[in-house]
């Protein structure tokens, strides 16, 4: 197992992506962005409506990755929290990989409300050593409100 670090993130409004840029600058890690083949609406409320309509079992097609998570000792995963859970593109990514032996450091961004999605991440990454997550809470205007561990 390599000691290299891979940063994987999904962003919709840009907040999670901004955090990813900071992490990449500090760690000099490799980076992959999760991008759904069919983009979600830019309007957050339309996206929420679509996600609820699609249902909890929906998994969209996402971009192909150039990096293999198994070739990294550590993977940092960043994602927003959507409608009380992990976004469908993130679930597609998590379910497509073998996490045994990988160390995961997660961070979650959320729009104003703290929702614990850590158990959902744990259930999708069987065999990984998962660190306690960081929760970055923002309001809907992108103002930072709180940091929770």
What do the PLM-derived regions correspond to, one by one?
Residues 131-149:
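Glycine-rich phosphate/pyrophosphate-binding loop and the adjoining helix
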Residues 69, 95-102, 124-129:
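Short, conserved loop/helix-junction motifs that constitute active-site signature segments
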Residues 1-77, 84-91, 95, 144:
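N-terminal beta1-alpha1-beta2 submodule of the flavodoxin-like/Rossmannoid cofactor-binding fold
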Residues 116-117:
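Active-site-adjacent betaalpha module
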Residues 28-30, 129-132:
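Conserved beta-strand segments of alpha/beta enzyme cores
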Residues 108-113:
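Short beta-alpha junction loops
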Residues 33, 106, 132-135:
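Structural signal for conserved beta-strand scaffold positions within catalytic alpha/beta enzyme cores
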Residues 77-78, 106:
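Redox-cofactor binding/interface segments in oxidoreductases and associated redox assembly factors
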